[in-house]
Regions:
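Carbohydrate-interacting/catalytic domains
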Residues: 1-249, 278-288, 556-559, 570-578, ...
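Short acidic/polar active-site loop segments enriched in Thr and Asp
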Residues: 49, 151, 294-296, 412, ...
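Non-transmembrane alpha-helical segments in soluble domains
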Residues: 285, 334, 402-406, 455, ...
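A short acidic, glycine-rich active-site loop
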Residues: 319-323, 438-445, 554-556, 600-612
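Conserved alpha/beta catalytic core and glycan-binding cleft of carbohydrate-active enzymes
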Residues: 410-412, 430-594, 626-696, 703-704
Length: 749
């Protein structure tokens, strides 16, 4: 028998197997017909005492012979077809039953591979990665990874003592996907892929499609079952599917989950203390409900190794970061927010990725996800790598990732980070550091096609999910229809308004009249895109100071100007986003290492603090905004806005209307600390003008310069308008008047 068994030994392949260099383990492991009357069963079990084959339905076991001294076993079993069987493995007097990992059929079929190669498999995350399942009555985990240029790939983990020779994976062509079902591996088990590169090097890589990962600084992937969470947000999803975000009120609260609030944990520094997703859900939800926000936008929650990157250097695109708990915990967070009518937008980073050894960089020994040429593949500013958007599989990886967060975790929006860096080949680069496109230009044609494709994919589902671009240049048609050559986003961050306004507001009020045009500039291009006004985290870090810290003047001036700022922002066309802490005048610049300065809201000498009154104003303003359709229904239509006064630079005052079918609002903004007892405002029609919001009201911490009585217009021309009203114009304030037309009686001839 020994001599006969030896006739079937493929020694070169067996040696490659034992060195972890075998890409076709199915040729030397598992069962196959040796001849018409014998089945050859082989297995690799290093460092065990004996192995036998137990055939299903048979009482007899067939002891396997160790063909060499490295743990390669074989046996010839009489039979005309391959039976069902298991291995009986003995070590130190203990026997255990082990199903054969190489007896299972492939789960990657030709259609899967064709779609992936063509970049159109938007559920590829259901195939690649780690998926606990039961196959033929055997519980285990199915692993699959894309590594076309690797010589061999093994899945390693605690379940096989991290040995690369124990579970070599089977390569499936033409896609270059390695797969293997490993019996006995389940939820919570650690794993990585051991990749034998064409250079002869061996590296351990985290799974690009892993659903969970170890808490940093550890880097292993974790097997997780995403099918067990039971969602309860059906009503929210049904409403969202009918939602027209262009015509709805959108108030976004931008949040860094790990620094909103932090628990006190004995023996840990504050920077290492985090609430879990489940713990954070009611805390954040209650606050957003109290404040009147419609959505939260989470700075990246995808797995990342470095806290100081704030999540913008991602290594685990399919894994909610373990800093705050498990994938089920994150699902609970989103579900909880939805059940309380708050949407969840995710920051997403398709522009670049870090060079960490366990991540995507040179994944299979080649530049698989990135460009080979560093002029195309590296971001000099960030020290990161740029995706190769010209490779179908890379586009598929990213597109499927966005769809994964939408489908698997029910998120309501995707905010794409650093879009400008994707659009321009020379972004952040000097001459000689970039490669022109086929036409000699600096436009990244492949990135453009990718952005159009991903927006198309998201919007074709008609689920009501928003896409938002952080795009800092004047690239045309960011929110234009893909069919018309646009990129297809729902909204673009209005960086122009933000930069102009922040420069203006940091100017001493005495000199603001010289920069008056900065207040009105944004309306010159307002209708070129569908905009979202933002005061984001980027503006309160890196020495820029908090919103409170930017503003000149004393404490009261700062708080008054913040009320004015947020009121002007609410009245200006465009959806809104504000970074956490700025709504109550956080004094210190933001840091991811500590929670917000909530103590600023505590009473001072038994009285409400100015910061608490500012918070109350923002809460009132948010509710006010949602109650007045004129402030949001026609954000993208010129008919929804009208200037009344743009030239009063000497007083640093602007006046405008916001309009919709059912209401007209008049807004005044005074950007100096000067109070005007009788300020004349030209109005376009005769009517009654009732003040319904004044940021200088005493209850908000102001001086109380309000207009308690309705103002009746007079037939007196002012600012080119046929009628006018006279109001108290409060210092550093925004005031909103409800306008009601009154029929003018004609004089008898």
């Amino acid at each position: 028998m020994a001599a006969k068994l030896d006739d079937f030994m493929q020694w070169p392949e067996i040696e490659a197997l034992e060195y972890g260099e075998c890409s076709r383990p199915q040729d030397v492991l598992g069962a196959r017909m040796a001849d018409r009357s014998h089945v050859l069963v082989t297995a690799y079990f290093p460092e065990v005492d004996s192995v036998a084959v137990r055939v299903a339905g048979a009482k007899k076991e067939y002891k396997m012979e160790e063909a060499d001294r490295q743990g390669y076993y074989g046996v010839l079993i009489p039979g005309r077809k391959i039976p069902e069987y298991v291995f009986m493995v003995e070590k130190k007097g203990k026997r255990r039953e082990v199903p054969d990992a190489y007896a299972m059929d492939s789960l990657i079929d030709g259609m899967d591979m064709e779609k992936f190669i063509n970049g159109c498999h938007d559920t590829i995350y259901e195939k690649l990665g780690a998926h606990p399942m039961t196959r033929d009555g055997v519980e285990g985990t199915y692993f699959a990874v894309w590594a076309p240029n690797a010589r061999a790939v093994s899945v390693v983990g605690d379940f096989n003592q991290w040995r690369e020779d124990t579970h070599p994976m089977i390569k499936r062509e033409p896609a270059g996907i390695y797969e293997l079902f490993v019996p006995g591996v389940g939820k919570g088990d650690l794993y990585k892929f051991s990749i034998y590169q064409s250079t002869g090097n061996r590296v351990l890589k985290a799974d690009p499609f892993a659903n969970y990962a170890e808490l940093r600084p550890a880097t292993a992937s974790v097997v997780w079952d995403l099918t067990k969470y039971s969602w309860k947000d059906e009503k929210w999803l049904a409403r969202r599917s009918k939602w027209n975000c262009e015509k709805e009120p959108v108030l976004v609260y931008e949040v860094a989950l790990g620094a909103f609030k932090k628990p006190k944990i004995a023996g840990r520094e504050e920077r290492d203390c985090f609430y879990t997703y489940k713990e954070m859900a009611p805390l954040l939800c209650e606050y957003c409900e109290k404040m009147g926000y419609t959505h939260v936008e989470l700075m990246p929650v995808m797995e990342h190794p470095f806290d100081g990157s704030w999540g913008y250097q991602v290594t685990g695109y399919y894994a909610p970061t373990a800093r705050y708990g498990t994938p089920d915990d994150f699902a609970y967070f989103v579900d909880y927010m939805h059940q309380h009518d708050i949407g969840v937008i995710l920051d997403w980073v398709p522009a670049h990725f870090p060079k960490d050894q366990h991540g995507l960089a040179r994944f299979d020994g080649t530049c698989l996800f990135e460009h080979l040429d560093p002029r195309q593949g590296e971001h000099p500013h960030w020290g990161t790598l740029i995706y190769n958007y010209g490779r179908n599989e890379v586009v598929n990886f990213l597109t499927a990732n966005a769809m994964y967060w939408i489908r698997q975790f029910h998120v309501d929006g995707i905010r794409m980070d650093a879009v400008a860096s994707m659009l321009y080949l020379d972004y952040g680069k000097q001459d000689g550091e970039w490669v022109a496109n086929m036409y000699g230009g600096n436009e990244n044609l492949e990135a453009i096609a990718f952005l159009q494709h991903i927006n198309d994919c998201i919007h074709k589902e008609k689920s009501g999910v928003m896409t938002i671009a952080e795009e800092s240049t004047a690239w045309p048609q960011v929110t234009g229809d893909v069919s018309d050559g646009g990129l297809g986003f729902d909204f673009k961050w209005n960086m122009g308004w933000m930069n102009d306004y922040l420069e203006y507001i940091q100017t001493d009020p005495l000199f603001r009249k010289g920069r008056h045009g900065m207040l009105t500039m944004s309306m010159l291009y307002q209708y070129s895109e569908d905009f979202m006004l933002v005061l984001s985290h980027d503006e309160v870090v890196h020495g820029k100071g908090s919103m409170y810290g930017k503003i000149p003047g004393d404490h009261q001036d700062k708080l008054s100007t913040l009320r004015l700022t947020y009121g002007f922002m609410a009245a200006h066309p465009g959806k809104k986003l504000l970074f956490m802490g700025q709504e109550f005048g956080q004094i210190r610049e933001w840091s991811e290492e500590r929670e917000l300065d909530w103590q600023l809201l505590d009473p001072v000498d038994g009285q409400e603090s100015g910061h608490e009154k500012l918070r109350q104003f923002v809460s009132y303003l948010n509710v006010f905004y949602q109650a007045h359709p004129a402030l949001y229904v026609n954000d993208t239509k010129p008919s929804g806005f009208q200037w009344l006064s743009t030239l009063d630079a000497d007083n640093s005052v602007i006046v405008f209307l916001r309009k919709c079918k059912d209401e007209t609002l008049l807004i005044t903004c005074n950007f100096t600390p000067v109070y005007h007892e009788k300020f004349k405002v030209g109005v376009p029609f005769a009517g009654k003008y009732k003040e319904i919001l004044n940021s200088d009201a005493v209850e908000f911490g102001g001086g109380g310069h309000v207009n308690p009585r309705v103002k009746n217009s007079k037939r007196e021309k002012w600012d080119g308008k046929p009628n006018s009203i006279e109001i108290k114009l409060a210092p550093l304030s925004v005031q909103v008047f409800q306008c009601t037309k009154v029929a003018v009686k004609r004089k008898k001839a």
